[in-house]
């Protein structure tokens, strides 16, 4: 299917540890929206940003659970 630019519905998904404030998440969503408009030609009215917050105990990096990390 060939969609016109204005008909596309971009979705940006951000996965991050739980703990950011609502103000931080709002600022992040604004920055992502601005970047998608500027660099990807997205229309703000069509852009979806989904923030998935994951508890540290449900995330691992390099074989170490997030709630066990020291850095």
For the regions a language model picked out, list residue spans one by one.
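A domain-level signal for the structural core that forms small-molecule/cofactor-binding pockets
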Residues: 2-71
